[in-house]
Amino acid sequence: TGILPAENRTDMARRIYESDTGEILMNSAENGFVLTTPRLEGVLVRETLPVRADKLEVLSSSVPAMTAAASLDAAKPLGESSHLLVVYSTDALNSSMRFTSPDRTVIEEVGELPVLIRTGRAKIAVRNRALRNPAAYVLGFNGERRERLPIRRTEDGKLLLEFDTGNFAGGPSPFIEITGQE
């Protein structure tokens, strides 16, 4: 017997590491990272798709991105929340930012505003049974709704979002709100 529970997926030979609570899973061999908590789930998408947590699944992404879904209802888990925030965070750098090498580990010049955000296309599914008639909105950096996005429920009950951040009105944003239609 060891410190980790028997169902823990840690496999050092395959460079897979899971926390003792099961909330964090890192696959070093595939540059993957999955965070699973009752109200927040996130995945790091680099190369291998699809990537799935428990309720959140990234079916496709045209660029590397961190994707997360969070319940905005204080006491409700992600799958039962009627108000969600999805974050699709791609590469973001200050204008004129410079590094000492291509791997960008040491900053040579911090750069200046505006921040340049890499655009991307993604297909994201969230298993949620509370939102019967969902509506999705791109949010600006100030939290205001900028435009409505198409969202649909699949036959197996998932909420499905497909979007291209390069086509958002007002420019790219990593933030999408999902709520019941008003």
Per-range role (PLM):
Residues T1-V138, T154, L160-E162:
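Long, low-hydrophobicity ectodomains and other hydrophilic envelope-associated domains
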Residues G157-E182:
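C-terminal beta-strand-rich structural cap/linker in extracellular carbohydrate-active enzymes
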Residues R129-A130, N142, Q181:
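Surface-exposed loop/turn and intrinsically disordered segments
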Residues G143-I151:
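Surface-exposed loop/edge segments in extracytoplasmic proteins
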